[in-house]
Amino acid sequence: MVKVAVTGALGRMGSGIIKTITETDGLDVVAAIDIPNHPKKGQDIGELTGLGKIGVSLSTSDELEAILKESGAEVLVDFTAAAPCVNTAKTAAKLGVNLVIGTTGFTPEQRAEMENAISENKVAATISQNYAVGVNIFFKTLELLAQKLGDYDIEILEMHHKFKKDAPSGTALRAAEIIQNNLNRDSNIIYGREGITGERTKEEICIHALRGGDIVGDHTVIFTTDGERLELSHRVTSRQSLVSGAIRAIQFVADKKEGIYNTFDVLDLN
């Protein structure tokens, strides 16, 4: 039985992951953690998420180290925000706890700080901007399209719910990174356009971020040339697709000794 701790336990992803862990053989929720001074601290996380009592009380991140030690957690799952996630990852790594990280919005410095802690403490982690199986097939397909349609103009459009705090999305940034790595030409990423921008240059890969309503996550990459346009789209209609992917990542990383992995590793797409 793999003992799992979940941070952001009452968030959209955290609560979904907790529910699915309780339905998954071989996994057990041993700690549920949210922000300091949370008014529901001490209440049973099962009752808070509609599962009924499961015997795990909501804890807060200011006591993370003690909680991880007491619970004996083997894997910690984090879908929160960049700054607290870095601190959480450092604490977990120091204690020898493996990680599944789905948080986005890291600066390069934050990402490096987190990865250094993981490597120095010789734990294992999966880090991904999007754990949905379909979006990773989308990423894999982008590799081929970028190789074969490298002389086309390329634009990326992403849309999310009005509550999303970072832009562009981690998924859009990952798509742009994959495209750049597979083009046989120079390229540079820009973000939206405004004013008199002049003609579009061949090097541009432009990301456009839209926000509104309750959209879970839409991503489209558009390849255009004179006379034709090819669009590759992925749409998440339920967070359960992300949750299911995170569960697979927990199962994957649980018995790993050390290393930093992504969802291509989890899904054997490399």
From Swiss-Prot:
GO molecular function: 4-hydroxy-tetrahydrodipicolinate reductase; NAD binding; NADP binding; oxidoreductase activity, acting on CH or CH2 groups, NAD or NADP as acceptor
Predominant cellular place of this UniProt entry's protein: cytoplasm
Binding site for NAD(+): G8, A9, L10, G11, R12, M13, D34, G102, T103, T104, S128, Q129, N130, Y131
A UniProt-annotated Pfam family: DapB_N
EC number(s) on file: 1.17.1.8
Subcellular location: Cytoplasm
Residues noted as binding (S)-2,3,4,5-tetrahydrodipicolinate in the record, renumbered to the chain: H161, G170, T171
Keywords recorded for this protein, A-Z: Amino-acid biosynthesis, Cytoplasm, Diaminopimelate biosynthesis, Lysine biosynthesis, NAD, NADP, Oxidoreductase
Record GO cellular component, one term: cytoplasm
Residues the record marks as active site: H160, K164
Catalytic activity: (S)-2,3,4,5-tetrahydrodipicolinate + NAD(+) + H2O = (2S,4S)-4-hydroxy-2,3,4,5-tetrahydrodipicolinate + NADH + H(+); (S)-2,3,4,5-tetrahydrodipicolinate + NADP(+) + H2O = (2S,4S)-4-hydroxy-2,3,4,5-tetrahydrodipicolinate + NADPH + H(+)
Biological process annotations from GO: diaminopimelate biosynthetic process; lysine biosynthetic process via diaminopimelate
NCBIfam families, A to Z: dapB (TIGR00036)
Similarity comment: Belongs to the DapB family.
Name of the protein in question: 4-hydroxy-tetrahydrodipicolinate reductase
